[in-house]
Each structure stands twice: as C-alpha cells, then as structure tokens.
C-alpha cells in the first residue's frame, strides 16, 4: 500500500514500511502504476492530482468531530487516531490541536522554527542567526543567538505546556522530535499522519479494490 502526504514544500510517502520524501518538483515527475492514497494541502497541485487516475484522495472519507472552520486535512489525519491528547505537528508551521474523547476542541498555529529565523532576519540583519538548540530555558540569555533561541523555544514550550495541561502529547513533523525533548512524557511519532490515513482505509476497505 502506497500512502502520500502532500504539503507545500514536500510530498512524504510511506510504501508499506518504507518512508521517503520528494520535493514538489520531484513529486511532479513521480510515476507509479499502483494505487496511491493521498491527502493534499497544496492548492497548486489540486488540478494535477485530479488528472492522475491512480491517485485516490482520502480527504472526503474523514469524518472528524470538530466545529473548527477550515481545519486542514493534514491536521485532521494527524489527530484521527488520537482519543485524548494534544497533537503537535512541527513543520513549516507548528500546529497544536487538542483532542478529548475523540472530539477536536480547537487548536492554534505558530510559525515553524525555520520561519522564525526568517522573521528575525527581516527585522534586522543583526538578528540573522542560527539558533542554539542547547540553550537553557531556565536562565536568562546573555548573547543575541541565545536570546533569539530562548524567545522562540520558550515561547513554543509555554504555549504547548499551557494547552496540554495533563494530557498526553503527541509530536510529529520535521522538528517534532526536537520539540518533544522539552517534555517528560511526550511521544514522537514520525508516521502519525500515515496512521490516520491507514485508519481511514481500514474503515473503508472498498477503497482498496
């Protein structure tokens, strides 16, 4: 079974248990004869995907209990296997969604870590810097690189901590593993979105035929 999660920068694939990533240009050249079950948040690719006969869009099959307007299919898929907890998908944006008794209570969005860097560099050339991923969140910074890093990482940490209360935390996405390290009982699951997609196919076995 070949699954594909298409974002704005990359398309991530799971081929049985083999995970691989293509950038969007590579994805447009990608050819495969078997059925490809996908979700897509990239508006520019919608027409292209409609013309690919072996690409099956899973989005219409997700029945998700939420009153959130315009919730992205990637966020729905990431939350779909979680009954209780907070789901953090840390990519080009960081999305935080709160689930209780399989009901989506709401969520919020932050810039991704790489985009914080861009924001700082736009403010001033003096704020163009790499982040110190080892910066302590328990001591006030004494140099610019640490000050920028502290502002980003502590801000993200406190918002997630406040949303989580005592709920389990589930992290996914490119920076998910890094952010999960700030929390004692966090679970990092690189394949969380794919688990949601697999659950949909299991609920709709006719899709396989």
Swiss-Prot record:
Residues engaged in binding substrate: 68, 72-75, 144
Cited PANTHER family: TYPE III PANTOTHENATE KINASE
Gene that this sequence comes from: coaX
Residues where ATP binds: 5-12, 92
Cofactor(s) the protein requires to work: NH4(+); K(+)
One of the GO biological process terms: coenzyme A biosynthetic process
Source organism: Campylobacter jejuni subsp. jejuni serotype O:2 (strain ATCC 700819 / NCTC 11168)
Quaternary structure and partners: Homodimer.
Taxonomic superkingdom: Bacteria
Enzyme nomenclature, EC number: 2.7.1.33
Cofactor note: A monovalent cation. Ammonium or potassium.
Family to which the UniProt record says this protein belongs: Belongs to the type III pantothenate kinase family.
Residues binding K(+), per UniProt: 89
GO CC term, one of those recorded: cytoplasm
Described function: Catalyzes the phosphorylation of pantothenate (Pan), the first step in CoA biosynthesis.
Name used for this protein in its record: Type III pantothenate kinase
Active-site residues, Swiss-Prot/TrEMBL: 74 (proton acceptor)
Protein localization: Cytoplasm
Keywords tagged on the record: ATP-binding, Coenzyme A biosynthesis, Cytoplasm, Kinase, Metal-binding, Nucleotide-binding, Potassium, Transferase
Reaction(s) this enzyme catalyzes, per UniProt: (R)-pantothenate + ATP = (R)-4'-phosphopantothenate + ADP + H(+)
GO molecular function: ATP binding; metal ion binding; pantothenate kinase activity
Pathway: Cofactor biosynthesis; coenzyme A biosynthesis; CoA from (R)-pantothenate: step 1/5
SUPFAM superfamilies: Actin-like ATPase domain
